Amino acid sequence: MQLRVGLGSKKYHIKLRKESKNKFWLGGVDFENSKYIYDLENSDEVSDVIQLAVADALFGATALGDGHIVFNKGKSTVQFKGTAKKEAPRVLARTYNFIRKNWIINNIDISLEIPQEQKVDDYKHAIFAFICSALRISELTINLKVRKPLDSNEINCLAVVLVERQKTK
């Protein structure tokens, strides 16, 4: 049995939301009434710190390298097809397609730092359901802790994953 651990981290600047048309994704869930949005001058167009941190951790644990490079075949910037609304939910599902044949996900531990004004507890079940669906795992596999960040203009996510190599027949 081969077990491997991966660590993923994402940090983005956020700003107060002024228009309702702006999307704020966390864990594949659109926080419709969010007080914040990602500051796109300092982040990718498809920003979702939870998904990107978990994807980075999975790529690291399975020794597949940097997810941005794998998704884009060597391009240095993220270039998704379609709009952020269509692509944000696909990050983990696309990651799963790279690892599913050789790896089983045993555990995902997520630590999210977000300003207290943004309530996450009401969305936890939806975040868990999304991650479980995208990665085809049980809710018992995931843990999510929410803390207040040191800088109220940032959102940080740290993800640690444990994967096990599947036996090949």
Curated annotation (Swiss-Prot):
BP-aspect Gene Ontology terms: terpenoid biosynthetic process
Alphabetical list of InterPro entries matching this protein: MECDP_synthase (IPR003526), MECDP_synthase_sf (IPR036571)
GO terms of molecular function: 2-C-methyl-D-erythritol 2,4-cyclodiphosphate synthase activity
Name this polypeptide is given: Uncharacterized protein MG459
Organism: Mycoplasma genitalium (strain ATCC 33530 / DSM 19775 / NCTC 10195 / G37) (Mycoplasmoides genitalium)
